[in-house]
Amino acid sequence: MTKILYGNEVALKIKEDLNLRIDKLKEKNIIPKLAILRMGNKPDDIAYERSIIKSCEKLNIETKVEELSEDILEEDFLKLMESLNNEKEIHGILVFRPYPKHLNENTINSSIALNKDVDCMHPLNLERIFEGDLNGFMPCTPEAVIEILKYYDIDLKGKNIVIINRSMVVGKPLSMMLLSHNATVTICHSKTIDLPSITKKADIVVTAIGKAKLIKEEYFNEDSIVMDVSINVDENGKLCGDVDFENVKEKVGAITPVPKGVGSVTTTLLLKHIVDAAERNS
């Protein structure tokens, strides 16, 4: 029988610990605070912003939102970032991606203070992960994948894991993190030939391609553990992942649902990183 790997159970456990830690910070008159930088008014960004603010409010984490024009000059953005880096009450900084095309992504990411880089966007923080050091901030989504697997006692050592994503946001950092846990990792992408033949041999498949219900049962074997990272909208306007959940759910060993899967843990880990930063800087 297929096991459903609910992320909201993992998130709840993390939040219970965060409540205790936030109370201790409050005794020192420290309130964890996140700065959110959003360029433009894309509906997806606004929805994500609201969900983060709502999650922060539930844990008494403060937020400061900087609503910026998509046409903002790079020098003006960097001045704002310098100000936020120097603001002692700000413990974490999150910049929504993708950036407007006229901004240099590396320059923007490099402008975030290392100790406030709660989603691991700075090249030096990413470099640390590629060197096998998982002691600092990690990208929230890849970390969420690993936290769910750990929560359900799925040992990564020696596992053959296929990641369908090669971005610096998910695929590449996740591959390095999994290697640090002694997994054997294969990265696939849009140019991969005969993808199902590769995924079907894997113990664990992580998909993050952003295509609603594209992945069907022929991609898996009966023991496959399926981690669906994507949050898409189907033809009926309902949230779904890359995997056709109803088609697959009885034909694999375990699977994360969408919603209530990886996404719920991703947001919770962002909150954890804010609290981590507040504690380190207290």
UniProtKB/Swiss-Prot annotation:
InterPro entries, alphabetized: Aminoacid_DH-like_N_sf, NAD(P)-bd_dom_sf, THF_DH/CycHdrlase, THF_DH/CycHdrlase_cat_dom, THF_DH/CycHdrlase_NAD-bd_dom
Q: Which organism is it from?
A: Clostridium botulinum (strain Langeland / NCTC 10281 / Type F)
Q: Report the superkingdom from the record.
A: Bacteria
Gene name for this UniProt entry: folD
Its UniProt entry gives the catalysed reaction(s) as: (6R)-5,10-methylene-5,6,7,8-tetrahydrofolate + NADP(+) = (6R)-5,10-methenyltetrahydrofolate + NADPH; (6R)-5,10-methenyltetrahydrofolate + H2O = (6R)-10-formyltetrahydrofolate + H(+)
Pathway, per UniProt? One-carbon metabolism; tetrahydrofolate interconversion
What's the protein name? Answer: Bifunctional protein FolD
Biological process (GO) annotations held by this record are: L-histidine biosynthetic process; methionine biosynthetic process; purine nucleotide biosynthetic process; tetrahydrofolate interconversion
Report one GO cellular component: cytosol
Keywords, alphabetical: Amino-acid biosynthesis, Histidine biosynthesis, Hydrolase, Methionine biosynthesis, Multifunctional enzyme, NADP, One-carbon metabolism, Oxidoreductase, Purine biosynthesis
Q: Which family does it belong to?
A: Belongs to the tetrahydrofolate dehydrogenase/cyclohydrolase family.
State whether keyword Oxidoreductase applies.
yes
Give the Gene Ontology MF terms in alphabetical order.
methenyltetrahydrofolate cyclohydrolase activity; methylenetetrahydrofolate dehydrogenase (NADP+) activity
Function comment: Catalyzes the oxidation of 5,10-methylenetetrahydrofolate to 5,10-methenyltetrahydrofolate and then the hydrolysis of 5,10-methenyltetrahydrofolate to 10-formyltetrahydrofolate.
Residues binding NADP(+): 165-167, 190, 231
**Enzyme Commission (EC) number:** 1.5.1.5, 3.5.4.9
Q: Does the keyword Isomerase apply?
A: no
How it assembles, according to the record, is: Homodimer.
